[in-house]
Amino acid sequence: MKEYEIVCTYLNGCAGAAHPIRTFEEAELSSPDDYIREKHSADFSRFTKEIQSDGKIVYTFSETVTYIYEFTEI
């Protein structure tokens, strides 16, 4: 298991929200995939996954609402 800092950004296009909502947490995970699958089981297959050059893992779901999860190993 690895420890991650997780930043979740939520944008609601329908409600006309002008500002994103961000949450921060630290968690010990066996896999960031499992974390996303647990939170969004119905939509997991529609998330895109990107591994950035600095090792950060970013999952994005963008439809009426947008979720962006950033996992940084600590």
Report each predicted region and the residues it spans.
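Short, non-transmembrane alpha-helical segments in secretory-pathway proteins
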Residues: 31-36
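N-terminal targeting/docking segments
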Residues: 6-9, 22, 49, 66
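Short, mixed-charge low-complexity intrinsically disordered segments
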Residues: 38-74
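A short, exposed loop/beta-hairpin motif centered on an aromatic-Gly-Thr core
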Residues: 15-29
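Short aromatic-glycine-(Arg/Gly/Cys) micro-motifs in beta-strand/loop hairpins
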Residues: 1-19
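Short, solvent-exposed coil/turn segments at beta-strand boundaries
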Residues: 1, 26-30, 52-54, 73-74
